[in-house]
Amino acid sequence: AASLGITSVQNASGSIEELELYDELLRKGKLTLRYAAAFSTGTKTNDADINTFTVIKNKYAGNTLLRADAVKFMLDGVIESHTAVMMEPYSDAGVNGKTANGEFAWPLPLY
C-alpha cells in the first residue's frame, strides 16, 4: 500500500477480527500502512462490550501502525440516503424526516 502512496486507512465500523488480521500482518513485517479502527455500538452493546473495546484500545496504545481508540455511536442515518432525522420533510425525496424505519437508531431516552 505504501508503495502506491497509501499511508493510512480507517474503518469506521471495524471489528476485532479485522484488527487481528492487521496485527498478524504487523507481526510478519508486512503491514505497510497505518490502520485505525472504530468499533460500532448498537442497542445491544453492553458493559462487557465496552470493557472489550477498552482492553483492545489499551493493547494497541502507543503502537504507531495500529489503533483502536474510537467507538462509533449512531443517532440516525445520513442526509444523502434520506435516512437522517430532519426537522422538516426532505425537499427532494425520502420520508417525512425520519429514518428508513421511521425511528431514531436508539430509543430517545438512551441519547
Task: Show where each model-derived region lies.
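Metal-coordinating catalytic core of metallo-dependent amide/deamination hydrolases
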Residues: 15-111
